[in-house]
A protein has these predicted regions:
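Active-site-adjacent structural elements that line small-molecule/cofactor binding pockets in enzymes
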Residues: 1-196
Length: 196
């Protein structure tokens, strides 16, 4: 069984917290997007650890574009020598439209396309495939060499998706590398709703 532990947002102490969690035998270190950015603590943790996965648990996908998260994911995966896991979640309509001032519609379909766009961007960077992603919600068709990362030895990070309902769970099964269950999810719910 793998067990992850969370770090706080105090950048003066997060590296020591991460090192302690790794020494205690945790499998991964998570950083959540609540009152602070979820990525910066993991950048600090990457410098003080060598074994544990570094996971956003979660980062709000719809507050950003796929290109922004492709860059962040690439940089953290490179900084951690391939240990970064991009944990994404949709959040709810009110937060996306009122707090982040971003569009909201069809969250499961949007998330599916978001992750496929990420993968298309990374395929351009890591496999040299042409960037020709055109969808209903996202379009990424321009990538010149100046904007493509050159430190690509670790490849793309894994993508996990937070899912509660059946539609987002289907998306996770289709396009993500793993699923993040909500903290209130029971064993019965996982068995009867999520797993089928």
């Amino acid at each position: 069984m793998k067990v992850d532990g969370g770090v706080g947002w105090d950048l003066a102490t997060v590296a020591a917290q991460a090192q302690e969690l790794e020494e205690m035998g945790y499998s991964g270190i998570t950083s959540a997007e609540t009152s602070h950015d979820p990525f910066l603590p993991l950048a600090f943790a990457a410098q003080q650890t060598s074994r544990v996965d570094l996971i956003t648990g979660i980062a709000v996908a719809f507050a950003r574009t796929p290109m922004i998260l492709a860059n962040i994911g690439h940089d953290l995966n490179a900084a951690s020598n391939g240990r970064f896991v991009l944990g994404l979640g949709s959040q709810i309509r009110a937060h996306i439209t009122k707090r982040f001032s971003m569009p909201w519609s069809n969250p499961a379909a949007r998330m599916r396309e978001f992750i496929l766009a990420l993968r298309a961007i990374w395929a351009n960077w890591y496999q040299g495939e042409a960037l020709e992603f055109t969808g209903k919600f996202y379009n990424h068709t321009l990538m010149t060499p100046f904007f493509a990362p050159t430190n690509t030895e670790h490849g793309a990070p894994r993508v996990f998706l937070a899912a509660v309902g059946p539609l987002m769970t289907e998306v996770a099964g289709e396009v993500a590398d793993g699923i993040i269950a909500h903290a209130f999810t029971t064993e019965k719910y996982l068995r009867e709703v999520t797993m089928p």
